[in-house]
Regions:
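A short, aliphatic-rich alpha-helical micro-motif
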Residues: 1, 71, 297-301
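Conserved small/polar residues in nucleotide/adenosyl-binding loops
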Residues: 3-11, 390-395
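Metallo-beta-lactamase
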Residues: 9-10, 103-151, 206-209
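Conserved beta-strand hairpin/beta-sheet module of binuclear metal-dependent hydrolase folds
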Residues: 10-65, 153-156, 160-164, 264
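Active-site metal-binding motif and surrounding structural segment of the metallo-beta-lactamase
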Residues: 45, 56-103
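Active-site neighborhood of phospho(di)ester-bond hydrolases with catalytic His/Asp-centered motifs
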Residues: 50-52, 75-82, 103-105, 162-165, ...
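Active-site-proximal loop/helix segment associated with metal-binding centers of metalloenzymes
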Residues: 147, 151, 167-201, 244-249
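FMN-binding flavodoxin-like domain, especially the glycine-rich phosphate-binding loop
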Residues: 174, 184-222, 226-229, 270-286, ...
C-alpha cells in the first residue's frame, strides 16, 4: 500500500517518515534536502517494530504501522537507539499497543525511564541474544558510542538485513523510493559524509569496533534510521563509514579562513592559486563567516590537507575561526596535513594560536606560516605563494 512499502515483499515493511520542515538537525546542522526518520516493521508470526520516529510525526507514523499490521497487535518494539528523533514516539506507541514488549539493553532502559517514564513490559537483551519471530531470527549486537552508549544493531539472519540504527545513515529525505535500487542515490554520498562528520565524527574507534563485529555477518541489506535502505550500495556505505572512522582523507586541501576586511582572504586566495599551480585539483575554500560549520566539517573529514587562516581579534583568533576549530577538535580528527597563516594590525596572536591548535591535534605541519601585518604586501604575497607547498606523493614516488 502507499502507506507502508514492503522492503522485501516478504514481511519487512518501511514505516518511516520524511521531515521536510526542520531547518536544522539537532538544531545545528542545515537540512537543505530534509531528513528521514526510518522505522521498520516485521510482520511474521510475531510482529516486531524496529525503532520509532520523531514525535512531531507520530500521527503519520502510527497510521502507517496500523495499516501494515492490518488489525493485528504489535508484539515487540526493538529500540536500537534512544535519541528522540527515533525514540520520540515510544510513549504514544505504548498507549496504542499497551501489551507491546520493549526490547533493549540495560542502558536503553535507564534512558527509557528517564525520557518516557516507562518501566514495565521490558525485554532485556545482551550481546548475541536472539529473538525468533517465526520465519525471522533476530540477533542483537551492542554498538556502544555509535554514537550514544545504549546503541545496538539488530541482524535478521533470515533475510540478511542489518537494522543499523544511525550507522550508515545520511541526511536527505526519501523522495518516492525507499531502497537504493529504486532511486538515483548520487546526492546522498556527500550528505553521508556530512552526516558522519557532524553526528558520528568523534567516535571513530567505536565505529571501527562495530564494523569489526559486523564483518563476520553476511549483510545483503542495510536498514539505517536515516536515508535510503542500502542494498545495491551496501558495501559502498560500509566503505565510506570505514574510511571516515579511520580518518583517512582523500587527496585534496580544504582552506578555512576568517576575514573581516578581506586581507586574510587575499592570503587564502594566493595560497589556493599556488596549490593549483602545483597540481592540486581538489581545493575547497570556506569563509567561516559564510559557510555553515556543517559543510566545513564535511570537507575536513573528506580531505587530507587542512589549511587555516585567521586575523587576530582582541589578541585571540577570529571568533568564527575559533568556533570551527573547537568543533574539529571535539571530533578528534586524525592524520591531517596542516598549514596555517594569519594577519594582524598592531599585535599578532592568530598565527601562534593556530600553531598551538596544530600541535594539540597532533597533525603534521608543513610549510612556513605567513603572518601579514596590515595590508598584503608584495613580499608577503610571494611568501603566501611559496609557504604551503602541500607535498602529495607524486606519481613517480607512488
Amino acid at each position: 500500500s502507499s502507506a507502508a512499502s514492503d522492503v522485501y515483499k516478504r514481511q519487512v515493511y518501511y514505516v518511516g517518515v520524511n521531515d521536510r520542515q526542520k531547518a536544522l538537525f539537532e538544531n545545528m546542522w542545515p537540512l537543505p534536502y530534509g531528513v528521514s526518520y526510518n522505522s521498520y516493521l516485521i510482520v511474521d508470526e510475531k510482529t516486531v517494530l524496529i525503532d520509532t520516529v520523531d514525535v512531531c510525526y507520530s500521527d503519520i507514523f502510527l497510521k502507517k504501522v496500523a495499516d501494515a499490521l492490518d488489525g493485528r497487535s504489535l508484539d515487540y518494539l526493538v529500540v536500537n537507539h534512544m535519541e528522540p528523533d527515533h525514540a520520540g514516539s515510544i510513549r504514544l506507541l505504548r498507549q496504542q499497543y499497551p501489551d507491546v514488549q520493549i526490547v533493549g539493553n540495560n542502558k536503553t532502559f535507564g534512558m527509557l525511564e528517564g525520557y518516557h517514564g516507562i518501566k514495565e513490559g521490558l525485554f532485556e537483551v545482551k550481546e548475541g541474544d536472539t529473538l525468533n519471530t517465526g520465519r525471522h531470527e533476530l540477533v542483537f549486537y551492542m554498538a556502544p558510542m555509535v554514537h550514544w552508549p545504549e546503541v545496538m544493531v539488530t541482524y535478521d539472519v533470515t533475510d540478511k538485513i542489518v537494522f543499523s540504527a544511525d550507522a550508515f545513515g545520511t541526511y536527505g529525505t526519501l523522495d518516492g523510493g525507499v531502497i537504493d535500487t529504486e532511486m538515483n542515490v548520487e546526492h546522498y554520498w556527500e550528505e553521508m559524509i556530512r552526516y558522519y562528520s557532524n553526528i558520528v565524527g568523534k567516535y571513530g574507534s567505536p565505529v571501527q569496533r562495530a564494523l569489526q563485529k559486523l564483518s563476520g555477518l553476511d549483510i545483503q541489506t542495510i536498514c539505517s534510521t536515516h536515508g535510503p535502505v542500502w542494498r545495491e550500495y551496501a558495501s559502498k556505505a560500509i566503505d565510506i563509514y570505514d574510511r571516515m572512522s579511520r580518518y583517512e582523507g582523500e587527496e585534496g586541501v580544504v582552506i578555512i579562513y576568517g576575514s573581516m576586511y578581506g586581507n586574510t582572504e587575499q592570503m587564502a586566495e594566493a595560497i589556493a592559486a599556488s596549490l593549483a599551480d602545483n597540481g592540486i585539483k581538489n581545493i575547497v575554500m570556506h569563509n567561516v563567516s559564510k559557510s555553515p560549520s556543517s559543510y566545513i566539517l564535511k570537507d575536513v573529514f573528506k580531505y587530507k590537507g587542512v589549511i587555516v587562516g585567521s586575523p587576530t581579534y582582541s589578541n585571540q583568533l577570529f571568533p568564527e575561526v575559533e568556533a570551527v576549530l573547537s568543533k574539529i577538535e571535539l571530533r578528534e580528527v586524525k592524520n591531517r596535513i596542516f598549514g596555517y597563516f594569519g594577519s594582524f594590525t598592531w599585535a599578532g596572536a592568530a598565527v601562534k594560536r593556530l600553531a598551538a591548535f596544530g600541535e594539540k591535534m597532533k597533525w603534521e605541519t608543513v610549510g612556513t606560516p605567513v603572518e601579514q601585518k596590515q595590508g598584503l604586501s608584495a613580499t608577503k604575497y610571494e611568501e603566501c605563494l611559496a609557504c604551503l607547498l602541500y607535498t602529495s606523493p607524486s606519481p613517480r614516488d607512488a
